[in-house]
Amino acid sequence: MNKNIFVACDVSSQKEILELLTQIHTRISGIKIGLQYITKHSPEEIKQLSKFNKPIFYDGKFFDIKNTLIESVKSLKDLNVSYATVHLLNGFESLKAASEEARKINLRLLGVSVLTSFDNYELEQLGFKYPVEEQVLRLIKIAEKANLYGVICSPLEIKMIKKVAP
């Protein structure tokens, strides 16, 4: 069985999540919590997930001004998370500073470029002048320069990304 799997805890009930993890924790590599979970559960409930001795991936997609981004990253230390996501649109300086703070607390920051639900039309409506593929590449280069641990991408983008950030 492939153990390179993080289970997404995108259900509302903490009881349900703990029961599921009790059943499958030996067959997974980690636990992913997204906005649905994060906004419903307390820091204490997030910490409860640590009892399974698996890395916790905090998929909060932080996107804010530099100081707030840095403080948000620092606050994750108390939650015992191993990975967290930041939007690459935060820009190089903010990402570099956040990456430096993350390394101090042994947190791996992963960059989110263009949401997979976006198409060229949507990007254009938001004022972006480049198509999705080119925008993704531009943001990936920023992530690499800012020394992020990695990026989140569509499986369709992997080949393209490896050309600019091996």
Residue ranges and their predicted role:
Residues M1-V11:
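Boundary/entry segment of secreted carbohydrate-active catalytic domains
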Residues I56-F57, L109:
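Hydrophobic beta-strand scaffold residues
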Residues N2-K3, T68-M160, V164-P166:
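Conserved anion-binding
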Residues C9-H25, K32-S50, K66-T68, K162:
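Conserved alpha/beta-domain cores
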